[in-house]
Amino acid sequence: MNPRCLPFLVFALLGLVTPGSGAEVQATPLRLTRERTFLTLTGGTLPGPVTIHYIEAYCRPGSTHQDWRTETVIPHQSALIAARPDGSEVVIRDTLSDGVVVEHTITARADEVDFQIVARNPTERESPAHWAQPCVRLDRFAGANKADAQSLVPPYARQCFLFIDGQMTRLPTEPWATEARYQPGQVYCPAHVNRNDVNPRPLSPLVPSSGLCGIYSADGRQILALAFEPYQEIFQGVITCLHNDFRIGGLKPGESKTIRGKIYVVPADAKKLLDRFERDFPEQARRPASRPQKS
């Protein structure tokens, strides 16, 4: 190489990684792997792996006040149908004990995970499958100690948010519910869902105006956010987790329903996140919280 060219080469290489140059080195895409009933999300700008219990449970109505294991949960079996070698997509099929089949196509992209879900009832009996729980574990993203998860308001909850009357609202919300069949935790029931049909943890009187919820990273520079359409509840859980649980609403014989969802891993710009969410979920865009359904 001509020595006179060396300074120009060094300058060009530096230009590739100069912040704001428009030619920055890009983060690797997000990647999905699956083991048993757990998805693991890695890559991108994540500070560490994010584990998702997918699906933790399929649930019957009446769940707010009844025994979780014996009355609410519908047993199911889960099978991996396909997985791309590069971790960009997995297809999962869940078969519920009443015969309902739920197929999930889950695609990882640069800064999001997309969920396309089809629930169908091939039987001649109506199914009570009303909602389902993807449980997103956030301890590594939030820099949280899992030992604190059973606190009344665990430290990681203070990094969490949802939207009330269209405004980002940080937890703990006021008032903070404390009474329920099981404690602790905090459940937020949207106006379109019967308040008898959510998680049997403390139920907030506050009504979310959309399903968008999330958490700030330990350094405050990123947001991991969740959304499904339709959704059943938002739940700050008891294992350093956050839920935006999706709604099925029961299935008549031969009926099929579609659900879609997103996980976003984005810079901590709340306005950009909300704008993107409203493009992806126009059904929930700036939807005012109406009166909740009566218990």
Model-derived regions, located:
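Extended, loop-rich substrate-binding clefts of extracytoplasmic carbohydrate-active enzymes
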Residues: 63-110, 128-130
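Acidic-aromatic substrate-binding/catalytic surfaces of carbohydrate-active enzymes
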Residues: 24-80, 89
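Low-complexity, serine/threonine/proline-enriched polar segments
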Residues: 150-198
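Positively charged n-region of N-terminal signal peptides that target proteins for export
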Residues: 1-5
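Bacterial N-terminal signal peptides
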Residues: 7-17
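Acidic (Asp/Glu-rich), glycine- and aromatic
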Residues: 108-165
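Beta-strand-rich recognition/accessory modules
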Residues: 23-24, 84-85, 93-95, 183-293
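Residue-level recognition of well-ordered beta-strand positions that form the cores
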Residues: 93, 105, 116-120, 135, ...
